[in-house]
Structures are given as C-alpha cells and as structure tokens.
A protein has these predicted regions:
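Bacterial N-terminal signal peptides that target proteins for export
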Residues: 2-12
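The canonical Cys-X-X-Cys-His
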Residues: 42, 47-55, 111, 115, ...
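N-terminal signal peptide c-region/cleavage motif recognized by signal peptidases
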Residues: 20-21
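Disulfide-stabilized extracellular ectodomain repeats and their linkers
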Residues: 46-49, 65, 73, 144, ...
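Surface-exposed interaction/gating patches
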Residues: 122, 126-168
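Axial heme c-ligation environment in periplasmic c-type cytochrome domains
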Residues: 60-67, 82-118, 123-129, 160-165, ...
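Electrostatic cytochrome c docking/interface patches
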Residues: 24-46, 59-64, 116-142, 216, ...
C-alpha cells in the first residue's frame, strides 16, 4: 500500500510540475498584454531591434533576419518571451531580449506595439516558382491541406491564437526556419512537428514558395521600396 501511495504521489508531483511549467510559459504573455503600450517608448526601444531588422523592420532578402513589420502583436510578444525564457533557441537574439538590454514587460509591450504599426515591404523575397507553375500549384494544394486551418486562407495568421502572419515573409527566411525545425534545432509546436514526418523537403519548398507569393493587403504595405521609417531619419 505504501509503495502504491508513493508511486501515486510521485506521479502527481510530475503532473503538477508539467502543468506549472506550461502555465509559467503562458502566464507572462497574458500579463504583458495587459499593459497599455507607449509607442514613443516603443520607438526608442526599437532602436535596439533596428540594428539587425533595419529601421523599417523589413529584415533581409537573404533570410538572415525576418520581416517583422506588420506581424501580430501577440505573435511578436510570444516570440520575444520564448527567446527570453530559453523556450526558443536563438543565440543571436538572446542578448537583446533580456531585461537588462530592452527592459521589462512594459518595454516589451511598447516595442511590439510599435513594430506592429510599421508598413510592410512591398517587394519582399519570393520563391522561384511563379503562379501557374506546377510547383506553385502543388504548394497551394499542400498549404490548403496542412496550413490554412491555423495560418488562414491568405496566410494572415491569427493574433488571438498567436499564429504568425506568413504573407509578406521572406521566402529564404521561411526556408531557413523550416530546416532548423526539421533538424530539431528549433523547438516548434507538436502540430508543426508532425508535418516533418508527413511532408518532404521538396514539399516544404513548394509550400513556402506558395506562401511567399500570397498577396499582402495594399493598406498594410509601404507605398514603395524607397520608403524609409520617418522616426529614424
């Protein structure tokens, strides 16, 4: 009886620890989203981010840095908190998201709100296969089958559920992230991890090619590629 009691207690302790760790991961984003953003402070905090992501938050065509302009507030916040806590392995970002560098929860709230107001690059990096090609059509079919239920029919994502906006993201960046996830160098949600047992590398290339060609609403775009963030002139 004592052995059974000890085993039950041990199992309950494990369940409590697992639940607590999951709650701890979710709770900060709920707390931070309660703050009222200060866009002026967000602009100042963004100076740290602009060193890599550029003042326009457009990132790089080669996929080194993503376009973060126009991304959902909840998505940006989740990514920053995941990197800060170590849930997401990103050594290049790790030093810049710590409290000693960018500040506390209020500062995070401010900077993600500021980023979300920036217009997107009207000429982001796209994949090699144009609409009408066999690869494009294959990518569209796979996207509808595996991705659209979370990321939306047009790649618009979902702010409330923290599903990233994919439309407008650089093709080379998405390919790099897919390879990191495939090689288990980036932690991803189980529903995403299951795709790597279903889809081939060629499938992923075609899906991401299709995503990179999804149109971004004109209202979310900068007027042209010559646009420069007026806050950084």
């Amino acid at each position: 009886m004592n052995r059974i009691h000890i085993t039950l207690c041990h199992s309950l302790c494990i369940l409590v620890l697992v639940f607590s760790s999951k709650l701890a991961a979710v709770e900060p984003i709920r707390v931070v989203l309660e703050f009222t953003p200060d866009l002026d402070n967000g602009r100042r905090s963004f100076e740290i981010c602009a060193r890599c992501h550029l003042p326009e938050a457009w990132g790089n065509d080669d996929g080194t840095y993503p376009q973060i302009a126009g991304q959902h507030v909840n998505v940006l916040m989740k990514q920053l908190l995941d990197i800060r806590s170590g849930r997401r392995n990103n050594p290049s970002m790790q030093p810049f998201v710590q409290e000693r560098t960018i500040g506390g929860y209020q500062d995070l709230s401010d900077v993600v709100a500021y980023i979300s107001t920036l217009p997107m690059n009207p000429a982001h990096n796209r994949g090699p296969w144009p609409e009408g090609s066999a690869e494009y059509e294959s990518g569209e079919r796979l996207y509808r089958q595996h991705c659209s239920s979370c990321h939306g029919q047009s790649g618009e994502g979902n702010n409330e559920l923290s599903y990233p906006r994919l439309q407008g993201q650089h093709y080379n960046y998405m390919k790099r992230q897919a390879r990191l996830a495939r090689d288990r160098l980036r932690r991803i949600e189980p529903v995403m991890a299951s795709l790597f047992t279903t889809l081939t590398e060629q499938d992923f290339d075609q899906v991401l090619n299709y995503v990179s060609h999804l149109p971004v609403p004109v209202s979310d775009l900068a007027p042209d590629t010559a646009w420069r963030n007026p806050d950084f002139k």
